[in-house]
């Protein structure tokens, strides 16, 4: 029922309510079906099945895995935990329907563009808004890109954090920047190899991280509902797409 979902409807005569009811009906069918054949039979009997237009309007669809990483962290800074993740600032403006960032609300009520990631980092703009600290800038950046994480705190507790908004600056992938810099080839690009590059020369990788001007904010999540997909429902390992 989120506005970001309703904005896409109606489409091809299908209302948001119909789409919502269909998802719930398929969920019930999955629970009640005793065999694969029973599920497929009732699916064909009771549903109209559409092929996605894809991102190119020609049926091309990309399915990706949902990454739910663990990181070590602390609610207080230290020599080990020195890379902060920040809560959403009160002057962040977003579109109420889509959730997309609009900019920064100024004192006169106007909206301007946020500073870049590098400018934010150098100015310590969000000092006092820290939610938690992780071990280094690459861990923090990885969580920025992923949008959520499970944190193993130094006191032994678990903390779950997730996306709470971002600035209106453009996104540039670290992987593409590393390839352009000649540090890795396309077939060698992986988080493990990026970690090796960072451990060898963190300043070099931080410079490439700064090319991504977008900056993400976080909030603490209910661990029983983490990680949640786009529908706000907890995803299932090896099943959810």
Where are these regions (language model features)?
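Secretory/export targeting leaders with adjacent low-complexity proregions
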Residues: 2-229
